Swiss-Prot record:
Disulfide bonds: none annotated. This is Large ribosomal subunit protein uL22. Keywords: Ribonucleoprotein, Ribosomal protein, RNA-binding, rRNA-binding. Belongs to the universal ribosomal protein uL22 family. This protein binds specifically to 23S rRNA; its binding is stimulated by other ribosomal proteins, e.g. L4, L17, and L20. It is important during the early stages of 50S assembly. It makes multiple contacts with different domains of the 23S rRNA in the assembled 50S subunit and ribosome. The globular domain of the protein is located near the polypeptide exit tunnel on the outside of the subunit, while an extended beta-hairpin is found that lines the wall of the exit tunnel in the center of the 70S ribosome. GO terms for biological process: translation. The gene is rplV. One of its GO terms (cellular component) is cytosolic large ribosomal subunit. One of its GO terms (molecular function) is structural constituent of ribosome. CDD domains: Ribosomal_L22. InterPro entries: Ribosomal_uL22 (IPR001063), Ribosomal_uL22_bac/chlpt-type (IPR005727), Ribosomal_uL22_bac/org-type (IPR047867), Ribosomal_uL22_sf (IPR036394).
């Protein structure tokens, strides 16, 4: 059984979120929550929140045994464009990026690792 959770329009850059997701792919949920608890990155809080939502969607609220992170990816959301004053009266663009984060968890017993 698979369960999915998504967070959309979150104000983090995709590159920073993807660094955290690389640490949790294809790992058990118990181990993943432990990693995210001690990770000194601000995006770890977001990823942990979405992961807990995915496990709750799987029907396991406190018992994470037997669940594994099958897929975790980040997509680009809309970019908020702002302007900063530059030299000689010019303006310089600032891109405030957003992300769409998706995590899919599945039972470890039914999970088949791709080779």
């Amino acid at each position: 059984m698979e369960a999915k959770a998504t967070a959309k329009f979150v104000r983090y850059t995709p590159r920073k979120v993807n660094q955290v997701l690389a640490l949790i792919r294809n790992k058990k949920v118990e181990k993943t929550l432990e990693i995210l608890s001690f990770l000194p990155k601000s995006t770890a809080v977001l990823v942990k929140k979405v992961l807990k939502s995915a496990t709750a969607n799987a029907g396991k609220f406190e018992d994470y045994s037997g669940l594994k992170v099958k897929e975790a990816w980040v997509g680009n959301g809309p970019i908020l464009k702002r302007i900063r004053a530059g030299s000689k009266g010019r303006s310089m663009p600032i891109k405030k990026r957003t992300v769409h984060l998706t995590i899919i968890v599945t039972d470890a017993s039914t999970y088949l690792r791709k080779k």
